[in-house]
Amino acid sequence: MSKLFWAMLAFISRLPVPSRWSQGLDFEQYSRGIVMFPFIGLILGGISGLIFILLQSWCGIPLAALFCILALALLTGGFHLDGLADTCDGIFSARRRERMLEIMRDSRLGTHGGLALIFVLLAKILVVSELALRGTPMLAALAVACAAGHGSAVLLMYRHRYAREEGLGNVFIGKVSGRQTCITLGLAVIVATVLLPGMQGLATMVVTLAAIFILGQLLKRTLGGQTGDTLGAAIELGELIFLLALL
């Protein structure tokens, strides 16, 4: 299980994980690592939260928010943001399903993808700033937001089909069992309720999961299934929705 955790951390993030820690693990086994997603999100969000706390007293809330969101993007190598941009380029092209999937595979950034990146990044910076001004404990808020975003992505894997013939997303989409889904969501909810006061954690998780479930159904109807790009989009939007629900 420890090998699987390190493999998933190396897969999702750009944190330096020695290859020997996950040596001998077959790529097809990665679907079992979905239960690690909330904890990996917790680590990435925790690092982002620490950066915010360290910079807040030195450069103020707005710049601290800017740098912690930038750090979060760098920690994942822009992996999820790239998925968000590709998804928006395809969906908002208003073409046939096959053409949408072709556009999503194009490495060039389109207008809709660029606008989506600007909107999501700017929204995160503004929401983090507002939460900090309201006295929200930012280490916990950012850590749980990332755990919620990563955990909620399982809703686009369970009982969904892969919209393409091959790709990274095929490792997870349609390969996750009901038990794994329940464990993943349960762990995300536990993290939220433990780290956030009162019923706030549970309430924000319910809002986030409901929104991502609806997103998954809309993408399924539009694309005929899910892709690795739509998983990245779900994680980014899940984080933003969770932070918005904290306001």
From Swiss-Prot:
Biological-process GO terms, alphabetical: cobalamin biosynthetic process
Flavoprotein is among the record's keywords: no
Pathway where it operates: Cofactor biosynthesis; adenosylcobalamin biosynthesis; adenosylcobalamin from cob(II)yrinate a,c-diamide: step 7/7
Assigned EC number: 2.7.8.26
Transmembrane segments: 34-54, 59-79, 113-133, 138-158, 171-191, 194-214
Compartment(s) of residence: Cell inner membrane
Keyword Glycosyltransferase attributed: no
Chief subcellular location: membrane
NCBIfam families hit by this protein: cobS (TIGR00317)
UniProt family annotation: Belongs to the CobS family.
Official protein name in the record: Adenosylcobinamide-GDP ribazoletransferase
Organism: Salmonella paratyphi A (strain AKU_12601)
